[in-house]
Amino acid sequence: MGTGPGVSGRRAAARPSSELPSPDSQLLWVGGHAHSSDSQVCHHADCQQLHHRGPLNLCETCDSKFHSTLHYDGHVRFDLPPQGSVLARNVSTRSCPPRTSPAADLEEEEEGCTDGKGDRKSAGLKISKKKARRRHTDDPSKECFTLKFDLNVDIETEIVPAMKKKSLGEVLLPVFERKGIALGKVDIYLDQSNTPLSLTFEAYRFGGHYLRVKAKPGDEGKVEQGVKDSKSLSLPALRPSGAGPPVSERVDPQSRRESSLDILAPGRRRKNMSEFLGEAGIPGHEPPAPSSCSLPVGSSGGTSSGINESWKNRAASRFSGFFSSSPSTSAFSREVDKMEQLESKLHAYSLFGLPRMPRRLRFDHDSWEEEEEDDEEDEESSGLRLEDSWRELTDGHEKLTRRQCHQQEAVWELLHTEVSYIRKLRVITNLFLCCLLNLQESGLLCEVEAERLFSNIPEIAKLHRGLWGSVMVPVLEKARRTRALLQPSDFLKGFKMFGSLFKPYIRYCMEEEGCMEYMRGLLRDNDLFRAYVTWAEKHQQCQRLKLSDMLAKPHQRLTKYPLLLKSVLRKTDDPRTKEAIVTMISSVERFIHHVNTCMRQRQERQRLAGVVSRIDAYEVVEGSNDEVDKLLKEFLHLDLTAPMPGTSPEETRQLLLEGSLRMKEGKDSKMDVYCFLFTDLLLVTKAVKKAERTKVIRPPLLVDKIVCRELRDPGSFLLIYLNEFHSAVGAYTFQASSQALCRSWVDTIYNAQNQLQQLRAQLSAQEHPGSQHLQSLEEEEDEQEEEGEESGTSAASSPTILRKSSNSLDSEHCTSDGSTETLAMVVVEPGATLSSPEFEGGPVSSQSDESSLSNTASSVTPTSELLPLGPVDGRSCSMDSAYGTLSPTSLQDFVAPHPVVEPAPVPQTPSPQPSPRLRRRTPVQLLPRPPRLLKSKSEASLLQLLSGTPAARGVPPAPSRSLSELCLISVAPGVRTQRPLQEGGPGWNGPGMCDPCHGPQLSESENRPSHMTGGPADSARRRCREMPSGTMSRVQSEPPSGVSAQHRKLTLAQLYRIRTTLLLNSTLTASEV
């Protein structure tokens, strides 16, 4: 340690002469300092005051008398106790001779050599040789432990030496006596432990740890009272009036400056143990009595008092300076200092108000702009003023109806909740965020990232201030001015542009989860941040809300807008106002859907990144030698984060299913694999040794090239992989652990194929927006051509169903079996084999016969949807005999139609009008297709095809009704019944939804009894489902209202004409036979 500011002569580390100073000893004044050959000279301010403002010559006895009672920072102490602890082993004592050479870390001084008689030698300056510095071999921080007091009384932290061969009670007893704490009324805990320590443990074991002192249950009051009594007894004696100025005012400024420099740079001088530890801190030395806390009265009769500023917590300050070289102790001391600074700052905020935003965040603003912003904030505060109820804005609210009052309440709730939300946003920005930034300006909580904690909440607050000022305030001002009702349609201006105004919410909703996690981590690990948040949550503006609750407000507010608007809509009667509210609701819900989509895609990307991290290598191809391996290395990779082929780049590949399976390829042995099914591909991987990562062992299988089949073996299924030519290039058999899991894999694969097909259709619609317009134009042209044709040229002609495609190879009518009514049309891919073994017989049963029930004119309304048919009700009147003649029972159906109740028809000349025919529709997907074979079968062929062998089945055939009878029934009011959607054909699974595997089908077997099922239609439909999605023809299904509307246009005369035509057809057919 260096000497004090007022000491000259020998250094503090050297012991003074043990002899008493002689009365006639001579003083030598060199450079303004007194030197004595056998005594020390003290220039301390207090010592000069005691010696009539002159330097004081002290021997060892006098020094012990005058300087042992009080502690002076930077003042030399001559009476050092003997070494009694490892902490004082580097101090010069009687048992350890003083060092005669300067320390290695001191600056070189000029020292004059004196002889034994006290004469100064005239020899030249001698430069002492530096010696190697002795360094500690132990960590000083482990030779002591920190004592924290977890009491209701403010007690400073103590640092206690951890001595060997001493128990914890023996070491803590002097400290507790000085604090006035009874050792038996408190418990000692180690760090964060909740188990009290035994006082018999060796104290040395706790070196470098924190010990907490906590009062035992029931003794809290006694411990607090003892500490208070101890503090009152240990107060220093006050100096009487007139004794002179305080000591702190009499200190020389130069001495104060040197003292501060010594404290700031303790490594520049030798440490004096007595200066830092004091007599109470050195083990083996008895502390001075509490009563000797003032300097003795000098010869002048004046008294001196202690220093109030340095009286509190001397030991803690000495230890912090002594252990400044230890990282852990210095960090703790800095933490204590920062906590005190934080508490003082927060206390100032509570007393003098919250601070403004730091200027460093307003570097682009001038002073006059800041003044304008302050004025704007005041205006905003006044603009957020809202009446207690909407009734204060309206005159004559007593005369309003109940429904009008409810509507005004709903509108008022929208306004009131908006004001409350803006105020909560201001609490976040002005209380939490602004105080945090100001604390960081002061050097506190600099490790906290404000943007990571609060995201873009300032942008959201600015957004809502603008929405309030530009949209909602005018509505209020209008109501205040006109004293009229609040009009919900006035909000359309702001909510119509909801998507563009509320864009900052996209970022906040994406980062909200990260902000919450970051906040929880800070509250768990950062004491300063925890204290700051606790203070802020107790502020009156926070209204007892937690910071986590405040951060969740933006997300909650966004989802509340549709609910508030729908509440207004339910209580509104005006059609124009309803239309405006519906527009606002759709705009808000569209934006919320967009936000949900962004969040879902972000979650899928995170999930996909987790899957990618689990895939270790891509080892699909093995090289034959090193050269091949080097060439292959460039291509042995798989990027799952790349966009899916044929879909929008915004779409993210999703993980649909994963799990362990047992795979068998060909005739090889089975192997355990781990499969990942994504939206567009299937990955077959194998676990590596660590079992946490996998490697790809088979090429990725594209979902649209997969054909999935269930096998007879329970829990197993087959995957056939096709190439671009629809040829099989691979077959994999997978075995699941259960039948349910196997079914789950098969269903998920089908769902993935459908989902991929939908995504590609959406991209095609976006890239070719004019294709739908072109399709509608073609449909209009076809309708005009059909309306211009006349069908009355031949009595033998019958209504026909027009073919869908004009580029077919076979477009002529097939007149097999002598029937003239063409009922169905077949569209079959060339080379497709859909025939069933049950119906392979004769040239009539071709491959087009079976598929005629599944792909028949998808745009036509099925006959079964117009009216329910019984099991034998669906017979045609012209087919009751083998020759096509009419039976007596069928003739009764053509008598004057009784169900039709109409007024007497006006006689009119029958005009040539087109016979009722079904409209032609173009396909949905206008893509190049291979030529299709179009074949039609007569009704007789259809009956034979549907019933198979009637004799074998024993059930008579059930043909369909004739077209004339259908038309008669369709025009009868109240006769036609509406069938459920699920009965309208297998293609109708819901409103507007078409079965992804097979299109709308015109099947008569749907209306037949249960014992008639299982025919070729079911077989064809099952085979269609098993076909790959790439080969399925997609058709468009339309609701059954078009055909019925067309039939309603027929008059009674036209129906009679149709009946006559059918009778003539039957007669001619019989005569020809």
From Swiss-Prot:
Gene knockout outcome: Animals develop normally and show no clear neurologic symptoms as adults. However, electrophysiologic studies indicated that mutant mice have decreased motor nerve conduction velocities and delayed compound action potentials. Mutant mice perform slightly less well than control mice in the rotarod test. Deficient mice have no motoneuron loss during their first year. A loss of motoneurons starts at 12 months and this decrease is more prominent in 24-month-old animals.
Domain (DH) ranges: 406-598
Amino acid composition bias (Acidic residues), ranges on this chain: 367-381, 777-790
A biological process term (GO) from this entry: endothelial cell migration
Keyword DNA-binding: no
UniProt KW keywords: Cell junction, Cell membrane, Cell projection, Cytoplasm, Membrane, Phosphoprotein
One family name in Pfam for this protein: RhoGEF
UniProt main location, coarse: cytoplasm
Ranges where the PH domain occurs: 654-754
Tissues with expression: Expressed in neurons and glial cells of the peripheral nervous system, with highest levels of expression in the brain and sciatic nerve endoneurium. Isoform 2 is expressed at detectable levels only in malignant cells.
Biased composition (Polar residues): 791-809, 844-864, 1030-1039
Role of this protein: Functions as a guanine exchange factor (GEF) for RAB26 and thus regulates autophagy of synaptic vesicles in axon terminal of motoneurons. Involved in the control of neuronal cell differentiation. Plays a role in angiogenesis through regulation of endothelial cells chemotaxis. Also affects the migration, adhesion, and matrix/bone degradation in macrophages and osteoclasts.
Protein name: Pleckstrin homology domain-containing family G member 5
Organism this protein belongs to: Mus musculus (Mouse)
Organism lineage string: Eukaryota, Metazoa, Chordata, Craniata, Vertebrata
